[in-house]
Amino acid sequence: MQLLLLIPLHYRLKDSKRIYQIILNLGSLLRISSIRQDNMELLELIIDPMIKAEVIERVSEFLTKTLGKIIVKCNDTSGFIANRVGYFLLELVARKAISQNLDVATIDKIFTTFLGLPSTGIFGLYDLIGYDVMKLISSSLLASLPANDAYHKIICKDPCS
C-alpha cells in the first residue's frame, strides 16, 4: 500500500496561542524514489477538531476530485499510519522469518503474490528503505507509543540480539 500524507497539524505555543495549519505533504516518509507521487492512491488525513468543517470539505473535495486520491481518515496518534502499519509488518515478518530460518525468497514471493506488496517483497523493501531509516522509525515509535502497544512486543532494542 502506498500512502500520500495530508496532515493538518496544530501547535501549542508557550503563551497558549494555537496555530492551525493544513500541510500537504505530497510524498511519504517511506517514499521510495522509484514510486511517483501520482501513483499513490491513498491519502492519510488527520484532522484537528478545531479545523472548520468547510475547510476540511473543500480540501477533501480538491484531493478526491482534482487529484483522484482516496482519503483515509486517521486519528491523531503517534506515528503515521504508513509507519505504524507498514513498519510493524516489515519488522514482524523479518524477525519471524529469521528466527524460524525461513527462506527469504519464499517469504517475499508470498507477500508479493498473495498480499499485493510491491515487487521488492518484505526483505527487498526493508533493504530499499534502508536500515538507518528503519532504525530512526523504530526509535521514534518506541519513544512515542504507549508501553502496552503491540509494537513493543515485536521489537528488540538491539537488532543483533
UniProtKB/Swiss-Prot annotation:
Gene3D superfamilies: 1.10.1040.50, NAD(P)-binding Rossmann-like Domain. GO terms for molecular function: oxidoreductase activity, acting on the CH-OH group of donors, NAD or NADP as acceptor. It holds the Pfam family 3HCDH. This is Putative uncharacterized protein RC0841. GO terms for biological process: fatty acid metabolic process. InterPro entries: 3HC_DH_C, 6-PGluconate_DH-like_C_sf. Transmembrane segments: none annotated.
